[in-house]
Design a protein with these regions (language model features):
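Short solvent-exposed beta->alpha transition segments
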Residues: 35-37, 51-104
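Exposed beta-sheet edge and beta->alpha loop/turn motif
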Residues: 92-143
Length: 143
């Protein structure tokens, strides 16, 4: 009798476990993957690791701005802003076209950031899907 009860329970458990992949989290959206890439890249810039931020940028970014020039430019801008304090996500939008850039896959992301010398700045970070299949930053602007 005991064997008869365990067979239906085993069958039910087998069906539950077979259905689990369907219950798993959906794959990460391209926008969320781009946002994670942008936030990781911004963390490098916030930490003053400007050379490493260039190393992690998209090939398009690197082709437009030499490493040394990037390090000088971002050091100057961040020096004027003062120490980084906080950042709040505002919005993001996927697009395949941007002015002055080749067609591709881009996500334009905006953050409100606070710095010691500028309490409310808008940062626009634009990751793109790079040739290696990874989202990498191709543009960064602060207003």
């Amino acid at each position: 009798m005991q064997g008869r009860r365990s067979a239906p329970i085993s069958l039910v458990l087998g069906l539950v476990f077979a259905a689990m992949p369907a219950l798993a989290a959906p794959p990460e959206s391209r926008e969320e993957a781009a946002r994670k890439a942008a936030e990781s890249w911004l963390a490098l810039v916030d930490a003053g690791q400007y050379g490493q931020s260039w190393d992690e940028a998209a090939a398009l970014f690197k082709s437009k701005v030499p490493r040394e020039k990037w390090e000088q430019m971002v050091a100057s801008v961040r020096g004027d802003l003062g120490e980084f304090q906080s950042r709040e996500f505002l919005a993001m939008q996927y697009t395949k076209e941007l002015p002055g850039a080749p067609d591709g896959e881009y996500v334009v992301i905006q953050f409100r950031a606070a710095y010691a010398k500028k309490k409310s700045a808008i940062e626009t970070v634009t990751p793109m899907l790079d040739a290696d299949g990874r989202w990498r930053v191709s543009g960064y602007f602060v207003k």
